Amino acid sequence: MKEIMAIVRPNLVKKTTDALSSVGFPAMTMTECFGRGKQKGYFAANMPDVVDMEKVIKEGKEMGLYLKYIPKRLISIVVEDADVPLVVGVIMKINRTGKHGDGKIFVLPTEETIRIRTGETGDIAIGN
């Protein structure tokens, strides 16, 4: 089993979750988070859910408040090893714009999964 952690733009979460559900992966956890890559933050007029990266890069300081960390969403999904390429591919297809801020995907080993309600373990407990 693997845990796939994807940090994506907030405006692409619905498209991403809909696409994952459509290929058989409706079970996931989402968290609001803030982060940055090498760009070291951006300027924005206020604290929106979605930052227009092209406008930020063009206008810079003229936009107002400096955002050291950009609003993002973390999607976490545990899948069987064989499903990793499919899930990663779906996430990449929806979230790759080719611009700074597209996000990151981490694939981590998961030793065990236990469904609390039933006590089921392993792949059965994943629920996909």
Model-identified regions with their sequence ranges:
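Positively charged, small/polar-rich N-terminal and surface patches that mediate targeting and assembly
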Residues: M1-N128
